[in-house]
């Protein structure tokens, strides 16, 4: 029992190196390093470099591109280098230091000839004998790698590649429940037991190996313990060894991790996976593991050689000259080279890049207003801070920080404002919002696209239920869509007719004999479809939509807003009246819309339309778990129009005028259009006027927004008809880049719209409304940071990882991807499950960067004491800041910016 508990603990702790990966159809951005954020970004970068040879700093080409484009100010980098050198004193001639710095900061690689020089070996051996305890012991942990990594097979590749191929084969077989007609036998028992049943008949193993498989324990934990003992792995190194195996195929392991969280009967799936993988490794390695050295001396010797070669190359000191110095001097030189290694300078380049962006953003905000203080209207608020308010965790609050309830600016909307449109914080909404505000008397608002509703949606036109909220939060309610019974019966019949046709096609395709006949039957139709879709993508797509709308028209639907009893549902269906009031109040507070209502309030979710795109969900709403957010917008709009809800809101201090009407729409990000999802049958006269005004302005808004967006796509130049061109991109099934998605995202601004209104933020900024004056206890800010800001950081780091290490964290070239097992994409038929973004999503061309890989900058518009309180109360966020997983800046009531580092 003790051993099994230990193995459980090892696996639980080792999971930190991977992230749960949802199927590609419900793709949701994930931070690949979320489990590692207890360590600093720099330490994780060093660790990944050592254990997997993965570099998560921007490389030389990316840095040079950023400098050439003006995104990275070299003077900022040079100042960082100067500051770093001033912090230390080295007893080394200054000209050697200068030469070393001038050379290494270019990020040039050390030529192989330096590593192979005999004098370098002599110096390395000398240092190893004298000081290996002082300088190399820290590298011992990184030697705990899978045995198969250290053994080279007859083809000259690590034996771990054979292990990977075996695991890809078996994992695909287990996961595939939808594409194949015959699923893995005995999979209902467990992955491990199904593998035991089949592997003993697998002739890719020798007869002796199959006999070993027959004798394996039925308990996967016992199997893991047995293999680790067989390899003589120390118990203190169990976790590091298991982590190495999880990192070997982080995509497939991440998919199993996700499934283990979703289904109780698969909760031990990672344990099964590791047991199988370790057995396969043991079978393939055989007795060769005895030749693998257990100590770190060979790694340490190689490290010394690399460091000596680096010193000689970057300082321009020949190795024979180095040998002329005494041992203590040599040790000083090498210690300097070890301290000032290339990763240190890569990190400084990254920081300089981020500081340059931060400076440019501040200048944009300052240039957009005569002063930030004027935009904040500080004279309207009576603020009193403790003398130590600027010091984190030393804050006193008093009631004088409350908002003056009689403030005319806060309680009255501008007389000319006709509509207020609340958009998702998605960076793609920023240009669209800017063009809407420029087109007429319209105000825009930023809020997370799930609108604060923790729901699972059950839509009539979707096959499966979907959690329509951020992936880190479980749904608390289920909302069903329903229609008139007669209309629903007709629609279901139409659905069944369509699905039966597709099911028949799939059945023939996936079975041996019928698949031989399928080309003859479907060839003419599919050939015609291919030609039409290739030559006239926009027209063919429009025609298909017309046919679909005619033959499979979704009926007018309603939502189960009120609580219903449903014994078949594991979640409450609908809300109680008080819950409706509470969720409406919370959403309005998060939008900073508790007064000054316009006649027409639009809640706009967003969706993306593309054709033949396995990654379409990555372009949908991240706050809704990789789906469109129109459903949530419709639900909240319907709730806010209810008289009993408005009465409850009034009792809570939020008065919505009777003439104000809420509606719902979807912002289609691939075409920059606004599609109505829900408009009440009856509108007040002023709401109707606002609705018509917005509709009249929308064609011009779409044209301007599309022109701005299309100009950034690399494959087209200036276009005369941007709306039609955008529709063509969204309809073209050969288009690998229908839109840029969230590429170039860089910042998250939490504050009043006046701070950024009219400023071109280039579609790089998540914008969330917030007024610190209405948030006395800081709960609203904490909610924004814990939800939307966290989602934004995950998105940011997924784009970052896919750019700096595309081979490990990206998903390769879209044109050569293979959709596998209905869950993700591979390159070829035996690769890891590629869970990041494709090359075309982050690069404009093979050697031309588009996305700028910098960590998210969170900007909070509030006094210092508010931010300090946030850091004191939210340890999770404070750790992200202190460990450099994101950057934090604030702008206070006097217009002063402050970086919290």
Swiss-Prot record:
Binding site residues for Zn(2+): 424, 426, 606, 621
UniProt subcellular location: Cell membrane
Primary location class: membrane
Family listed: Belongs to the inorganic carbon transporter (TC 9.A.2) DabA family.
Listed cofactors: Zn(2+)
GO CC annotations on file: plasma membrane
Topological category with respect to the lipid bilayer: Peripheral membrane protein
Domain of life: Bacteria
Gene that produces this protein: dabA
Protein name per Swiss-Prot or TrEMBL: Probable inorganic carbon transporter subunit DabA
Annotated function: Part of an energy-coupled inorganic carbon pump.
Pfam name, any one: DabA
Oligomer status and interactors: Forms a complex with DabB.
GO molecular function: zinc ion binding
Alphabetical keyword list: Cell membrane, Membrane, Metal-binding, Transport, Zinc
PANTHER family xrefs: INORGANIC CARBON TRANSPORTER SUBUNIT DABA-RELATED, UPF0753 PROTEIN AQ_863
């Amino acid at each position: 029992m003790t051993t099994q508990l230990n193995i459980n603990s090892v696996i639980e702790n080792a999971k930190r190196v991977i992230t749960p990966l949802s199927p590609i159809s419900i793709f949701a951005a994930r931070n690949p390093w979320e489990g590692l954020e207890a360590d600093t970004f720099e330490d994780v970068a060093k660790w990944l470099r050592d254990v997997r040879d993965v570099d998560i700093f921007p490389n030389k080409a990316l840095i040079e591109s950023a400098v050439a484009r003006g995104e990275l100010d070299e003077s900022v980098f040079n100042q960082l280098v100067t500051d770093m050198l001033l912090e230390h004193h080295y007893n080394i001639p200054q000209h050697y230091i200068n030469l070393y710095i001038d050379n290494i900061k270019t990020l040039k690689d050390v030529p192989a000839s330096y590593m192979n020089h005999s004098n370098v070996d002599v110096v390395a051996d000398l240092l190893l004998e004298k000081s290996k305890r002082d300088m190399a012991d820290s590298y011992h942990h990184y030697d705990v790698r899978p045995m198969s990594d250290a053994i080279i097979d007859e083809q000259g590749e690590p034996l771990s590649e054979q292990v990977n191929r075996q695991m890809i084969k078996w994992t695909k077989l287990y996961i595939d429940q939808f594409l194949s007609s015959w699923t893995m036998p005995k999979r209902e028992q467990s992955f491990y037991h199904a593998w035991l049943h089949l592997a003993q008949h697998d002739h890719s193993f020798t007869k002796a190996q199959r006999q070993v498989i027959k004798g394996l324990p039925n308990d996967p934990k016992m199997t893991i313990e047995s293999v680790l003992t067989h390899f003589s792995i120390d118990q203190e190194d169990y976790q590091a060894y298991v982590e190495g195996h999880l990192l070997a195929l982080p995509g497939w392991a991440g998919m199993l991790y996700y499934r283990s969280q979703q289904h109780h009967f698969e909760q031990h799936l990672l344990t099964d996976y590791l047991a199988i993988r370790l057995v396969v490794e043991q079978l393939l390695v055989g007795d060769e593991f005895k030749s693998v050295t257990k100590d770190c001396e060979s790694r340490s010797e190689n490290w010394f050689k690399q460091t000596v070669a680096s010193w000689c190359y970057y300082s321009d000191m020949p190795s024979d000259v180095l040998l002329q110095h005494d041992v203590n001097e040599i040790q000083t030189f090498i210690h300097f080279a070890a301290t000032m290694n290339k990763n240190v300078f890569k990190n400084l380049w990254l920081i300089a890049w981020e500081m340059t962006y931060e400076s440019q953003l501040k200048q944009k905000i300052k240039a957009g207003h005569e002063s930030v203080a004027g935009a904040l209207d500080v004279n309207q608020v009576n603020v009193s801070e403790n003398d130590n308010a600027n010091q984190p965790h030393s804050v006193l609050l008093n009631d004088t920080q409350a908002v003056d309830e009689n403030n005319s600016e806060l309680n009255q909307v501008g007389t000319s404002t006709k509509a207020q449109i609340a958009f998702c914080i998605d960076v793609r909404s920023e240009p669209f919002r800017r063009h809407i505000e420029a087109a007429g008397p319209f105000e825009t608002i930023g809020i997370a696209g799930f609108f604060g509703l923790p729901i699972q949606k059950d839509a009539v036109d979707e096959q499966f239920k979907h959690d329509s909220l951020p992936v880190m939060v479980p749904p608390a309610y289920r909302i069903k869509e329903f229609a008139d019974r007669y209309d629903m019966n007709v629609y279901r019949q139409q659905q069944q007719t369509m699905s039966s046709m597709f099911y028949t096609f799939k059945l023939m395709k996936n079975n041996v004999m019928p698949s031989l006949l399928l080309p003859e039957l479907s060839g003419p139709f599919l050939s015609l479809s291919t030609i039409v879709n290739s030559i006239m993508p926009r027209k063919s797509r429009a025609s298909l939509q017309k046919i679909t709308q005619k033959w499979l028209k979704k009926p007018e639907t309603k939502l189960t807003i009120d609580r219903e009893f449903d014994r078949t549902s594991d979640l409450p269906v609908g809300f109680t009246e008080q819950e409706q009031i509470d969720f409406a109040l919370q959403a309005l507070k998060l939008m900073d819309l508790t007064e000054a209502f316009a006649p027409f309030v639009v809640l706009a979710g967003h969706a993306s339309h593309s054709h033949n795109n396995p990654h379409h969900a990555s372009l949908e709403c991240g706050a809704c778990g990789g789906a469109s957010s129109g459903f949530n917008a419709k639900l909240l709009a319907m709730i806010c129009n209810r008289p009993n809800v408005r009465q409850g809101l009034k009792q809570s201090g939020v008065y919505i005028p009777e003439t104000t009407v809420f509606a719902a729409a979807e912002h289609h990000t691939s075409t920059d259009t606004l599609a109505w999802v829900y408009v009440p049958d009856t509108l007040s006269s002023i709401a109707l006027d606002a609705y018509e005004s917005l509709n009249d302005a929308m064609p011009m808004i779409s044209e301007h927004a599309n022109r701005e967006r299309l100009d950034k796509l690399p494959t087209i130049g200036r276009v005369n008809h941007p709306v039609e061109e955008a529709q063509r991109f969204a309809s073209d099934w050969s288009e690998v880049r229908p839109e840029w998605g969230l590429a170039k995202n860089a910042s998250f601004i939490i504050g009043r719209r006046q701070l950024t209104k009219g400023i071109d933020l280039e579609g790089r900024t998540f914008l969330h409304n917030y007024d610190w004056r209405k948030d006395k206890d800081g709960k609203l800010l904490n909610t924004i940071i814990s939800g939307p800001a966290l989602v934004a950081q995950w998105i940011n780091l997924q784009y970052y990882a896919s750019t700096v290490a595309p081979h490990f964290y990206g998903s390769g070239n879209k044109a050569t991807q293979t959709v596998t097992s209905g869950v993700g994409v591979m390159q070829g038929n035996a690769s890891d499950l590629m869970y990041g973004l494709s090359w075309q999503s982050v690069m404009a061309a093979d050697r031309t960067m588009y996305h700028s890989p910098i960590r998210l900058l969170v900007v909070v518009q509030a006094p210092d004491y508010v931010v300090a309180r946030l850091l004191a109360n939210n340890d999770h966020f404070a750790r992200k800041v202190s460990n450099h997983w994101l950057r934090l800046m604030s702008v206070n009531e006097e217009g002063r910016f402050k970086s919290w580092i």
